[in-house]
């Protein structure tokens, strides 16, 4: 059996997905050690085979800086990401040698893992907990809000936005380049240039992507990384629609947006449960009842609530969207940051939901909610997407692909 280290950014949703994968690997007899922050609640679940390594103070501070900038200025966030990659590239070699790991499981959003693995001659697997970073001519980057199109104007827009993105990411690219040179590796500057040649595993499925024509043979859609299967809930007919609303763990502080959502749901005669993920004070949470909310909570059993709902209103985080697709529940996306605008664009393209600006008026939001609740044409497309998720294999297939890649030390197609 092998000892794996997991390297990932300090983002809770990524840690949850990777923790599910770690538990699956442990069940198969492997050892897994997390080298990431922001997993306090997960660390409480430490077992004999799933451990959380105490990181040096410099790494912890760099991870806190990324967390603090996740809702702030984009340039400061990029600077924080660059600093984290820098300190990880300095600290990881000694840590990995001390742990005597056999291979790495690396989140695509933290290139330090792949750089250090390659420098040490260790096999590594890339995991896309968000939208995959693989680039393709004719497709917008997975952080851009653009819809799929093939006309010249759209292609030009994709190209220009790619150049702008690369310019903004220049500090991070220079950090990647500097450490690649220091380790004696071929030059690289971008996340997609740091992907594993053995296996690239995505939480997504084709039903939640734009048409792909140039993915490598080692790329695999496996669907949601979950340790427990999605709940099997029969959505009983209701005279009053039930809506579940969440803006994720990083955006749960947006009181005014929650208030607008509550009022919009009430105006169309729907019940709404709002999960703010500890982002609101008790007084702020209570204020949502006066706006029409039926239930306001910090955290819930999200897969079950999503499965029982007639509609999910979300920031467009991939984990929440995958929960909705697993339950064949339509989605209204209100994208806020990161890859959420891109997830929303893919939802709309595949006919699985709609998107609305966070700046939209209450009436506009209510109109979108009413349209989705009354759209019977959604159900077949949602059923197809759910079946695709079920067939993709999920966490067990991801674990099998990792085992195959490590056993043969060659690309798994």
From Swiss-Prot:
SUPFAM superfamilies in the record: UDP-Glycosyltransferase/glycogen phosphorylase
Gene3D superfamilies in UniProt: Glycogen Phosphorylase B
A GO term, aspect molecular function: UDP-glycosyltransferase activity
Keywords noted in UniProt: Carotenoid biosynthesis, Glycosyltransferase, Transferase
Enzyme Commission number(s): 2.4.1.276
GO biological process terms, semicolon-separated: carotenoid biosynthetic process
Pathway: Carotenoid biosynthesis; zeaxanthin diglucoside biosynthesis
Catalysed reactions, semicolon-separated: all-trans-zeaxanthin + 2 UDP-alpha-D-glucose = zeaxanthin bis(beta-D-glucoside) + 2 UDP + 2 H(+)
Domain of life: Bacteria
Record protein name field: Zeaxanthin glucosyltransferase
Organism: Pseudescherichia vulneris (Escherichia vulneris)
Name of encoding gene: crtX
């Amino acid at each position: 059996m092998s000892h794996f280290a997991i390297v990932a950014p300090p983002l809770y949703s990524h840690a949850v997905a990777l923790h599910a994968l770690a538990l699956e690997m442990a069940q198969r007899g492997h050892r897994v050690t997390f080298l990431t922050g922001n997993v306090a609640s997960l660390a409480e679940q430490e077992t004999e085979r799933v451990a959380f390594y105490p990181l040096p103070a410099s790494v912890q501070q760099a991870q806190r800086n990324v967390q603090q900038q996740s809702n702030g200025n984009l340039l400061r966030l990029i600077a924080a990401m660059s600093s984290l990659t820098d300190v990880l590239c300095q600290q990881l070699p000694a840590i990995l040698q001390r742990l005597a790991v056999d291979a790495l499981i690396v989140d695509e959003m933290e290139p330090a893992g792949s750089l250090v693995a390659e420098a040490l001659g260790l096999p590594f697997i890339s995991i896309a907990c968000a939208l995959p970073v693989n680039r393709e001519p004719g497709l917008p980057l997975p952080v851009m809000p653009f819809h799929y199109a093939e006309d010249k104007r759209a292609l030009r827009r994709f190209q220009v936005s790619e150049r702008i993105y690369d310019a903004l990411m220049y500090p991070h690219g220079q950090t990647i380049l500097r450490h690649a040179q220091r380790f004696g590796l071929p030059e690289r500057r971008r996340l997609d240039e740091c992907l594993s040649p053995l296996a690239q595993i995505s939480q997504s499925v084709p039903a939640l992507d734009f048409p792909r024509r140039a993915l490598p043979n080692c790329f695999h859609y496996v669907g949601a990384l979950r340790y427990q299967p999605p709940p099997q809930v029969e959505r009983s007919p209701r005279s009053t629609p039930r809506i579940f609303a969440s803006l994720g763990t990083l955006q749960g502080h947006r009181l005014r947006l929650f208030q607008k959502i509550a009022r919009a749901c009430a105006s169309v005669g729907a019940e709404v449960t709002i999960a703010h993920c500890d982002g609101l004070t008790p007084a702020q949470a209570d204020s949502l009842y006066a706006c029409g909310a039926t239930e306001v909570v910090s955290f819930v059993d999200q897969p079950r609530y999503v499965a029982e709902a007639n509609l999910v209103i979300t920031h467009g985080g991939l984990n929440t969207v995958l929960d909705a697709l697993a339950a064949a529940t339509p989605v209204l996306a209100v994208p806020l940051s990161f890859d959420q605008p891109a997830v929303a664009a893919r939802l709309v393209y595949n006919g699985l939901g709609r998107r609305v600006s966070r700046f939209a008026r209450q009436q506009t939001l209510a109109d979108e909610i009413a349209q989705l609740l009354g759209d019977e044409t959604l159900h077949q497309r949602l059923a197809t997407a759910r079946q695709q998720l079920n067939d993709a294999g999920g966490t067990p297939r991801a674990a099998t692909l990792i085992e195959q890649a490590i056993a043969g030390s060659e690309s798994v197609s």
